[in-house]
Amino acid sequence: MDTDKNFNHENDSLFKKNIIKTSNNNLKELNIAFCFDDNFVMPTGVAIASIIENNKDSHLHFHLFFESISEKNKFRIFEIQNDNISITTYELQEELSVNPNTLILGIPKSTCLRFMVPFILRHEVDSVLYLDGDMICLDSLHALHDLNLKGHIAAVVADSKEMQQKASSLGYGIDTDKYFNAGFLFINVSEWNSKNVTEMAFSMINSGTIYKYADQDVLNILLNENSKLIDKKYNKTITLSPIDRVDDKASHGTTILHYVTKNKPWFMIFESQIFLHYLSQSPWKDTQLKLTPNASLLRIKAKKFLSDKKFFDWFKYFALYIKYKLFSK
C-alpha cells in the first residue's frame, strides 16, 4: 500500500468491509475500534469479551481492522455474540507499507492501522474509541457518551511519569507533560480528518526518521496541542511480574487495564486470573496458552520459591528453566 499518496475516496477500497452482525436497540451507541494481525486476534477477542461483559447499557459497535488472519480466527470473530453488539470487519487488501526501521521493541506494523480508522469511518461515526488488543475492560465505559470532544482531536490518558521523562529526552519539541499512551484514543472523527492526521502520520512514520516509540511518538507529536487528558483509570498501564499478581492489585478503581511490555497475561507464568476469566467468555477459550515469553522469567520464579522455602515449586520451575534454555528456539 502506497501510504505516500493523498488520502481520498479511493483509499476506502483498501479494506474489504464485512458487516457481520447488527443490533437494533435504543441504547446509546459506542463505536470501538481494534487493529490487529493473526498474532493478536486472541488477545483482542478477550478484550472484546471484557467490554461486552461490563457494558450492557450501551450498543457496542466493534470495528475490527486487520491484515493476514487465519480462516479459523475469522470464524471465531463470527462467533462473538451478545444482544447489544454490532460487528463490522475491515480486512486490508494490500500490504501495509511501514518503515521497518521504525518498528522496534517488537511493535507489529498492524499497529499503524490505527492511523486509518478515523479516515475510513469518517462518513459513519462522530467519534470512535480506539483500544489496543492487550487491554481488559473492568468497568462501564458509559461516561464516554457524555465526554465533550469539541476542539480536541482525541481524549487520551497521560503516560507514566517514567515514560514522560523518556519522551522529554527525545527532542520532539512537545509538552511531555501531555505525552500519552496511545493504547487508548477516544477520537473526534471530524476533527481528526480536518487536521489530516492520517496522511501526516503515515508521512512521518515513513519519512526515514526513527521514532523511539514508533506510532505512539508520531501521534503525540501530531496531537500534542489538540488532545484532552482524562482520568488514568481509562488506561491503567501495568507490567506483569512472575512473582506477584500485579493486575489483581491494579484492578481496583480501574476501568481499562493495559498490559504493557512483553509480559502479557496470556502467558501462564503470570497467573492472570483477570485475563483467564475473560478468555473463558470468548470464542478463544480453548486456546492452549504458552508458559512464558522467555526463560529468564522461569528462573526468577524459581528463585522466589526457593527464598520462600517452597522446594517442590522451586524444583519444578528450575527444571522448566533448564528445559527452556536447552530446547527453546
Residue spans for each PLM region:
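Short internal beta-strands
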Residues: H61-S68, A155-A158
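Active-site-proximal specificity loops/subdomain of glycosyltransferases
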Residues: F75, E79-I120
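Short loop->beta transition adjacent to catalytic acidic/histidine clusters or analogous donor-positioning motifs
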Residues: L30, N55-H63
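Short alpha-helix within the catalytic core of nucleotide-sugar-dependent glycosyltransferases
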Residues: F75-F78, H123, L138-L149, T198
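A glycosyltransferase accessory/donor-loop signature
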Residues: M1-L30, F36, I187-V189, N193-K329
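Short aromatic/hydrophobic "clamp" motif used to bind/position activated sugar donors
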Residues: V128
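Conserved donor-nucleotide/metal-binding helix-loop-beta segment in metal-dependent transferases, i.e.
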Residues: M135-L170
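Histidine-anchored nucleotide/phosphate-binding helix
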Residues: V41-N55
